[in-house]
Amino acid sequence: MKIIILTSSRYGTAAHHLPYLIESGTCEISMVILNEGRIKKNFRYLKNKVRKIIKIGPLGALNGIRMRKWFSHDISIYKEIEELESICYRYDIPFHSTPNINTRSTEDLFRKANADVGLSLGNGYIGQRIYSIPKYGMINIHHEILPDYQNAQSVIWQIFNMSSITGYTIHKIDKHIDTGDLLLQGTIPIEFMGSLRRTVARTSVSLLEASAIGLVKVLGDLDQYYTSAKPQGPGKSYTTPSIWQYFKILRNHKKLKEASDNSMYEKDVHKAAENVRP
């Protein structure tokens, strides 16, 4: 089976998952495409930006920009990820770039690749003109649980809702964001660290490792997963937190961290007691 990978990051999910796919031998990677993200700042773009700022507030918007590193650069503290183009060069995989996702350039590259299925790893909205080109369409990895956390950043909204569990979802791509039929889901515990920032970065590494294994599983038996795919049903969509929502996330993080520490302490005491011999 031939797959084409579309990504918007040189050091993100695609760079992490590509070695897993190569080593698994479950598929042939016909091409990797990097979206350079050259956004046309037209009226529609500016209108959407203003609408978002009104919704989450100027401080929320600025804080959102500050938090971006938590989900990208900070991951390197816990996991070294090789640059994507370097991996492609080493394994002789065709690597191309495109100015933006929904462009003629991307469309032409997809047709040239002639892949059976497309794989989206770390992208924004993908239009039908792109995702309908591969024989079996495209699939996406969303690092949260669907449909409850559509368009949500990993970990933070779980903490907002006082949950100590996060996860990933592999799903088909349709005309909306994070709404396609479900193929596979997995959950992991949030790894609470001394700060929210470190908690996000450390848990994101565990999410990457879990979703890479899940992706290999799906691609290894794609027909079966497509046959058993389930529609999502009603869901809830998220965006960047407002500054007040962020403060709530910080408070909840402190509570959940304390609960996690107490739980670990109790487990250690219980384990030590079991090891005591008369």
Residue ranges and their predicted role:
Residues 1-278:
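One-carbon transfer enzymes
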